[in-house]
A protein has these predicted regions:
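One-carbon transfer enzymes
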Residues: 1-205
């Protein structure tokens, strides 16, 4: 399975995917790294692994449609079959979602459908989780549709919140399980073990 990874930041989830591929745990190949930030750490990781990189930002285009066309041109050129959003902080254009329906997944640092939606990313998520008083948090891998964090949930794993947790300590715990479940979800897709029916998605054995 040829995967295009989209990332905006340091690229730790991107790195986790690469580790899984290198270890023979994920039968896939990363064909391109696309980022909306020219200085994203993920770009350096891609270059170190001789993976093609593309900087594509809405600021470079006159409309969302123009950005979508540019993204789709890159995906076609690189023969990308699947898209993994690994810390990508921008909404995917609707036309890209339509062309890759049920072939885009995102990793979110909380247990959706709680603590998701527009603007809920990074430290903000963990601050909101702790402020709510819930006793568990976690990570969610979900399919991407045209609403923020509303696509069918595929995989989740929890962490326990303790009384002295801070946004930073909770983020570290959640990030650890993100690195575990994201490659696992991609492996299920690569092996054809994902079933999707309406708003429900699950992995078969």
């Amino acid at each position: 399975m040829n995967i295009a990874v989209f990332a905006s930041g340091h690229g730790s989830n991107f790195q986790a995917i690469l580790h899984a591929i290198d270890a023979g745990l994920l039968p896939a190949r990363i064909v391109v790294l696309i980022s909306n930030k020219s200085d994203a750490g993920a770009i350096e990781i891609a270059r170190a692994h001789n993976i093609s990189t593309q900087h594509l930002s809405q600021k470079m285009f006159s409309s969302e449609e123009a950005l979508a066309d540019a993204i789709l041109e890159v995906l076609e050129k690189e023969h990308a079959e699947f898209i993994a959003l690994a810390g990508y902080m921008k909404k995917i254009p609707a036309h890209v979602i339509q062309q890759y329906q049920n072939r885009i997944v995102n990793i979110h640092p909380a247990l959706l459908p709680s603590f998701g939606g527009e603007g809920m990313y990074g430290r903000r998520v963990h601050e909101s989780v702790l402020a709510s008083g819930v006793k568990v948090s976690g990570a969610t891998v979900h399919l991407v549709d045209e609403e923020y964090d509303r696509g069918p949930i595929l995989l989740q794993k929890t962490v326990t919140i303790v009384s002295d947790d801070t946004p930073d300590s909770l983020a570290a715990k959640v990030l650890k399980i993100e690195h575990e479940i994201f490659p696992r979800a991609l492996k299920a897709f690569a092996e054809g073990r994902v079933k999707i029916e309406g708003r429900k998605a699950w992995i078969t054995s």
